[in-house]
């Protein structure tokens, strides 16, 4: 046997969406109900485990044989579930695939697993089996009754008089439904195999599978949580919200001061008309509101802070050994191949600005509500700032947090050949000061000569690198930072004039992509290759990885200009036709290349215990003797395919995760 395509149906009393597959399989009642498989492309078989059937010995052997490639759609689910099931059946025990000091858990080695969901994402398609089937027009899509059957057999049911008070539906409770469920299981394997056939001409490069396997190892390893801090933070938030609600009721006499509608009406009755009670809007109102209304708005701000949701997610996801696993979705952003967050959502953790973070953390950890309230006043904000600190290294270890310095700006300058910017990076200069200096033709130093211009340099750098104009400056908060409306267009013009190679790069990329779609003409710009093939626009990066745009064609944008359109997941999370153009493609290319550089660093440091990666940052669980400087030097090495690109990684050591 060379390959095994698999789909399983499982039961657990835990909510998979809320806790993730690692915790899901730790439920005492977890079990595999159906095991659908095809060995070496033969007709699909289904093993009805729930009814007492057994998986053939040669298939069991293949699951633990690293010479057999296992395929599944979202293979992580099958791999982790089967790891638990095989352990329960005495087939697979104490078979750690890493060294004893690692915490990858007793899971099947991911190196012999491949995932058609990842292949689909690599091809620019959705991350759901139904979505991929619909886009590819596969005849054997998931049966529409599938979701209802999963809910019926795979999740606990409410006890009722009609069902005899049972809390779980078994095959004998609905034989017809069970027969349909088995057909559905077979269909899933067939669809998964059809996807492989459809994509056979466009294999995923081996380096991407290696990245996937490293990603799975990091997800298996997980990261330790300080559960004492988590529990105390949740308890403190509950008390804080109760106190704030009482205070609000006293001031407003409202039945429910948390109600947006009631609060808007109360403010209106007190002379303050509001359209929204969003964070920005409340901050603006606080500048001009009378003192009595300011007090109410400040309390409203504190009540609206969702500081506890991340802690609750941690509580739901933490495994029996105190670690959270499965937090990173490989290829979650399929335009660039970047990761997406799962469960705790590491990519959008609140920042920390408290100067005495460790002291605040200590007070919360020991449940000193009065101390926190006395020293920090805003309890929800304090709890929010402490969320990162719930992630801790295992006993006897430290965290080394290292990230790339201005990686996107460096990659953009390298691609475009913007020499002055590359020189700034090479000399370790401040790009915001240097940008302001280029735009306004005067020296600019942070906290020094013309230091006030640095802010303009910063906002321009953040907003204008990918074709942004006045609207992008506003969206980035230029007006709130003190710039006036009539300063914005001159700032755009000044930035573009001082970065002419970048502007040229935008439109060279635009032209190459347009030629590929319009004339099927292959092209190359700065080492980036374009071609149209089998109804796909492919952009090949210097790393060798391809970006895929599905069913590209020409359209007309809102300005009446010819543009490229393609199919993808839009802002509404639905599959739709999207527009793109040169600067937007440059953003995809730069972010994708930055992602590839991070992957190169992860491979370089794969001998370390990487526990987390957030944007361009790695968090490593290191023994006390590991040298920070050496680790940062290794992370900052330039990949062989990026000759001339100047990288730098900076880091710090800490006993709990934080933003330094």
Model-inferred region functions:
Residues 199-207, 211, 597-618:
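Active-site palm subdomain of RNA-directed nucleic acid polymerases
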């Amino acid at each position: 046997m060379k390959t095994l395509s698999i789909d399983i149906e499982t039961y657990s009393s835990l909510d998979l969406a809320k806790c993730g597959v690692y915790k899901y399989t730790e439920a005492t009642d977890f079990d595999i109900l159906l095991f659908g498989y095809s060995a070496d492309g033969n007709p699909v078989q289904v093993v009805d485990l729930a009814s007492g059937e057994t998986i053939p010995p040669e298939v069991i052997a293949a699951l633990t044989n690293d010479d057999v490639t296992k395929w599944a759609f979202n293979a992580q689910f099958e791999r982790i579930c089967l790891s638990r099931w095989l352990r329960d059946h005495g087939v697979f025990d104490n078979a750690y695939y890493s060294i004893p000091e690692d915490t990858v858990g007793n899971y099947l080695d991911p190196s012999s697993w491949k995932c058609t969901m990842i292949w689909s994402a690599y091809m620019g398609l959705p991350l759901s089996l139904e979505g991929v089937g619909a886009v590819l027009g596969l005849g054997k899509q998931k049966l529409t009754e599938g979701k209802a059957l999963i809910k019926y057999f795979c999740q606990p049911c409410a006890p009722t008089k009609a069902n005899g008070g049972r809390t779980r539906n078994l095959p004998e409770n609905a034989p017809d439904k069970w027969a349909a469920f088995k057909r559905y299981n077979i269909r899933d394997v067939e669809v998964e195999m059809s996807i492989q056939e459809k994509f056979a001409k466009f294999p995923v490069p081996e380096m991407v599978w290696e990245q996937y396997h490293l990603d799975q190892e990091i997800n298996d390893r997980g990261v330790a949580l300080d559960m004492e801090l988590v529990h105390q933070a949740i308890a403190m938030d509950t008390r804080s919200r109760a106190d704030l609600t009482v205070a609000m009721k006293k001031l407003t006499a409202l039945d429910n001061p948390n109600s947006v509608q009631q609060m808007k009406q109360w403010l209106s009755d007190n002379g303050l008309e509001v359209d929204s009670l969003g964070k920005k809007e409340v901050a603006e109102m606080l500048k001009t509101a009378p003192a009595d209304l300011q007090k109410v708005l400040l309390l409203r701000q504190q009540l609206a802070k969702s500081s506890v949701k991340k802690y609750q997610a941690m509580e739901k996801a933490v495994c029996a050994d105190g670690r959270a696993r499965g937090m990173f979705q490989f290829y979650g952003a399929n335009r660039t191949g970047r990761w997406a967050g799962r469960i705790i959502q590491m990519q959008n953790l609140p920042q920390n600005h408290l100067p005495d973070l460790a002291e605040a953390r200590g007070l919360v950890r020991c449940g000193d509500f009065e101390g926190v309230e006395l020293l920090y006043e805003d309890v929800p904000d304090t709890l929010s700032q402490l969320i990162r600190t719930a992630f801790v290294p295992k006993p006897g270890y430290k965290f080394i947090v290292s990230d790339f310095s201005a990686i996107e700006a460096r990659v953009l300058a390298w691609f475009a050949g913007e020499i002055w910017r590359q020189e700034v990076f090479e000399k370790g200069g401040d790009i915001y000061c240097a940008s302001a200096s280029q735009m306004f033709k005067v020296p600019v130093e942070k906290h020094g000569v013309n230091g006030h211009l640095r802010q303009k340099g910063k906002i321009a750098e953040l907003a204008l690198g990918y074709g942004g104009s006045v609207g992008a400056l506003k969206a980035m908060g230029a007006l709130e930072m003190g710039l006036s409306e009539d300063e914005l267009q001159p700032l755009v013009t000044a930035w573009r004039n001082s970065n002419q190679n970048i502007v040229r790069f935008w439109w060279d990329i635009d032209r190459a992509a347009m030629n590929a779609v319009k004339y099927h003409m292959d092209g190359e710009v700065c080492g980036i290759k374009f071609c149209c093939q089998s109804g796909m626009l492919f952009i090949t990066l210097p790393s060798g990885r391809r970006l895929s745009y599905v069913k590209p064609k020409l359209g007309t944008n809102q300005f009446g200009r010819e543009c490229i359109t393609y199919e993808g997941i839009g802002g509404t999370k639905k599959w739709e036709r999207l527009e793109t153009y040169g600067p937007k493609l440059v953003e995809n290319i730069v972010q994708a290349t930055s992602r590839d550089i991070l992957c190169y660093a992860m491979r370089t440091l794969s001998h370390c215990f990487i526990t987390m990666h957030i944007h361009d940052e790695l968090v490593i669980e290191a023994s006390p003797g590991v040298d920070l400087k050496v680790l940062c030097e290794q992370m900052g090495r330039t990949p062989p395919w990026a000759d001339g690109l100047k990288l730098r990684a900076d880091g710090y050591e800490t006993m709990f995760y934080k933003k330094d």
